[in-house]
Amino acid sequence: MLSRSLNKVVTSIKSSSIIRMSSATAAATSAPTANAANALKASKAPKKGKLQVSLKTPKGTKDWADSDMVIREAIFSTLSGLFKKHGGVTIDTPVFELREILAGKYGEDSKLIYNLEDQGGELCSLRYDLTVPFARYVAMNNIQSIKRYHIAKVYRRDQPAMTKGRMREFYQCDFDVAGTFESMVPDSECLSILVEGLTSLGIKDFKIKLNHRKILDGIFQIAGVKDEDVRKISSAVDKLDKSPWEAVKKEMTEEKGQSEETADKIGEYVKLNGSLKEIHAVLSADANITSNEKAKQGLDDIATLMKYTEAFDIDSFISFDLSLARGLDYYTGLIYEVVTSASAPPENASELKKKAKSAEDASEFVGVGSIAAGGRYDNLVNMFSEASGKKSTQIPCVGISFGVERIFSLIKQRINSSTTIKPTATQVFVMAFGGGKDWTGYLPERMKVTKQLWDAGIEAEYVYKAKANPRKQFDAAEKAGCHIAVILGKEEYLEGKLRVKRLGQEFADDDGELVSAADIVPIVQEKLSQIHEDGLNEVTRLIKGL
Amino acid sequence: MLSRSLNKVVTSIKSSSIIRMSSATAAATSAPTANAANALKASKAPKKGKLQVSLKTPKGTKDWADSDMVIREAIFSTLSGLFKKHGGVTIDTPVFELREILAGKYGEDSKLIYNLEDQGGELCSLRYDLTVPFARYVAMNNIQSIKRYHIAKVYRRDQPAMTKGRMREFYQCDFDVAGTFESMVPDSECLSILVEGLTSLGIKDFKIKLNHRKILDGIFQIAGVKDEDVRKISSAVDKLDKSPWEAVKKEMTEEKGQSEETADKIGEYVKLNGSLKEIHAVLSADANITSNEKAKQGLDDIATLMKYTEAFDIDSFISFDLSLARGLDYYTGLIYEVVTSASAPPENASELKKKAKSAEDASEFVGVGSIAAGGRYDNLVNMFSEASGKKSTQIPCVGISFGVERIFSLIKQRINSSTTIKPTATQVFVMAFGGGKDWTGYLPERMKVTKQLWDAGIEAEYVYKAKANPRKQFDAAEKAGCHIAVILGKEEYLEGKLRVKRLGQEFADDDGELVSAADIVPIVQEKLSQIHEDGLNEVTRLIKGL
């Protein structure tokens, strides 16, 4: 009867499956995610055959497990500790928002938003970042000031480059400060958090590219760009990290209708980069800049910022780079993004792109991109307040976002053959040794002892088998990376005794210590505290780059 | 220029907004989520007026913040610690799956699945639970055995009852064991985890209702239910927690075509409940049961289970209840769910339901429902293996799921006026006191000192203001719940001294201690370790129900 109902379910899986494939295709889809591209193609060319489901995750997404998961959790815990250290509180917003909340915030990237199907009720979309939901939250709850952090997944229907950490579902770790404060103070704290965060993740060779939207806007005015052309010229400038100036200039003049002179004038400025001090000095000596209202405002901000980055001792990480534009609509002041040597695409990227067999994954011909980014957005909260009919109140905001998957891909490169990362937390393995005709295997007895350890907060396991030979139990203990075995000897246990033994190669010849079963918890606790005295574990070493 | 581009964005928000509302309606929508129902209604009756967005989260979802967030994070940390204690590793699967993966797994509840819009590419749906993605993961990676835990959001388009923790987006905290093991061993460990988890969350008055699908199937056979009717009769039995036997009997006979005798026979059995021992004894003495192959298999499992629940000392929490059926298709063995006194709907539920003004939220007339649940599903992994064209291999599974929002709603009830939960982790507030014409406010200096504390891992804040009077700084420190103030006195700081002062009512008259600026880090560390010696903080007390 039961099996009938199961058959029904299996049939229903099969009949509801949208994709028809031949058995040959199915074999291909059972390979790991890397083959997703092939699977997708195959699914679009249905062949005659058995109805089947493809065992894969959707394009641009993946399962996280084993030591990868341990490393990623360690990154989260490092960053959330950092955010808390700076007085951050955390919030959690829904993974989807009303569609209208996301509309008009992301410029050309709006096409990358995932929509939920209209199944009746409200129209919703998956969030594209954590910034817009944060601004919606601040406006909705009339919050005047908050420092909040948020670690959560966001969604973009972009071309994935999985091994470079560019995915369709990925985590952002955001810290934002909302509220009216002394100019550049929360901004410089955000920059300090960038430095502290990356340094504590063992990333040292990074550079914070920084610019100011007002300076950029001033430059465009000076160069003679019309107001209505600013956004499209800004998005041309934004390509300077990937394209040479000549290509960008061509885009400005041939595609975007600017004169040769305008383009050249922009070119003079956007080629500038150096320390805050250097570029500030250059711009301060430029009468065009100092006489342009917007550019002057931006330049004054930079002067203020310099006092604070010096107090935080983070100057050396910052490169004031006038070519940085950033695509998003909502930025109004400082903008910044963090790059490392892995951020840039390979030198022969365009060749590799041509050679790449499939465009489903771009890992072969792209770089990791920026690993963190942020900026000031002073009007976003008020847009929501006004658009919802609330009283207009400006709540200025500034924030940063760490790209965890990209940082993860850098940390992964540090792993060498000697790094062993244990995915379980298990400390103690409870075993039973015995034999003979009347030997039961002490399964309920092992459970009882294990339960005592659990109740004391100690991570403990035992094998799920009535009778297991010592070898199998030691193997299981080793696989779990346990430090200690608690052994129920057939005779010893009857006498109220347990054997406590250190595990590991160097203790192979050590029979351990026979102790009173009544004292097992304090004895194990004492041994564990000795073992853990030596400090850092492998994950911490890896994360910190030690 | 900038403001023009912003105007463009605002216009784009407005023109892209789907919902048109009058200003009056907009005022209503600016109220918190409780008014979501009204807002939705309003949005369905467009009126003439300004284009607007409604500042709300989608129906059945909410933002989490402040002390609620602290409490929920403490629940997660308690449960993940518990899962690790039992040797669990964690995995993370995408929030959406290929639609075909979810098809045919949830019986009548399949209609509650959220679909993603078809924007080209694969058809996907938001996950409905964590169990099906887990089984997909196990099958896809040919995993033979794993203990995994997963704490993540799931999605169901159900009627929400927000204050009872019944939401459309909610967390599940799952622990599952996959692999072929000694009968009932992982099952009893899952039950032990239920007891350990709820107890450590301060929930003591709960009952684990437990049944066995094979016994239930045997009973249906004994009563004369035809094989093809089993699922629908099972789903009638499943309603016994909400409806009286008479109503269920009526459904069986009048709607579902069973004879009076069959229904009465089922009734005899499903009314049985008591301890494992009691009901096991009753069923063992029943020749109908012992001679039915399926029922006998189930009964043997129960006998084995009893040995282990005794070893784990959890018998007293279990009620063997033959009326428990559970709706999901995939269970094959033990099934269980945890209820408390808050689980049941109010006694006058149907009256309240009639009175309730809106059916958008059911909080007024429903109970919290079960707060945790689970069971054995031995065929789900193999369904995926077979349907994907892989070799058929049975990987038996058993698991449990904690309903965090429901547990949260129980813990919230413990909060009384004296409970203060601090949403930030900030320990130290860095202040500057001074005055006079030449007083700068020591902002960069405060930053420098704060940075020293951050670098030593100490949670520290300062006010984001060039000059702030002492009152404002103390207020900010108090708001952040700080224990210590580090004060830069105008003269003292110039002499290389800092003042360290305990905060709080009882230290109001204490001027603190003047120390050398060079020693500030160890001195603050020492003071903090003294302060935290007294142990448990308010959140821990609240979570543990102390």
Swiss-Prot record, chains A, B:
GO terms for molecular function: aminoacyl-tRNA ligase activity; ATP binding; histidine-tRNA ligase activity; mRNA binding; RNA binding; sequence-specific mRNA binding. It catalyses: tRNA(His) + L-histidine + ATP = L-histidyl-tRNA(His) + AMP + diphosphate + H(+). It comes from the Eukaryota. It is an enzyme of class 6 (ligase). Its EC number is 6.1.1.21. InterPro entries: aa-tRNA-synth_II (IPR006195), aa-tRNA-synth_II/BPL/LPL (IPR045864), Anticodon-bd (IPR004154), Anticodon-bd_dom_sf (IPR036621), His-tRNA-ligase (IPR015807), HisRS-like_core (IPR041715), HisRS/HisZ (IPR004516), HisRS_anticodon (IPR033656). CDD domains: HisRS-like_core (cd00773), HisRS_anticodon (cd00859). Belongs to the class-II aminoacyl-tRNA synthetase family. PANTHER family: HISTIDINE--TRNA LIGASE, HISTIDYL-TRNA SYNTHETASE. NCBIfam families: hisS. Catalyzes the aminoacylation of histidyl-tRNA in both the cytoplasm and the mitochondrion. Present with 26800 molecules/cell in log phase SD medium. This is Histidine--tRNA ligase, mitochondrial. It comes from Saccharomyces cerevisiae (strain ATCC 204508 / S288c). The gene is HTS1.
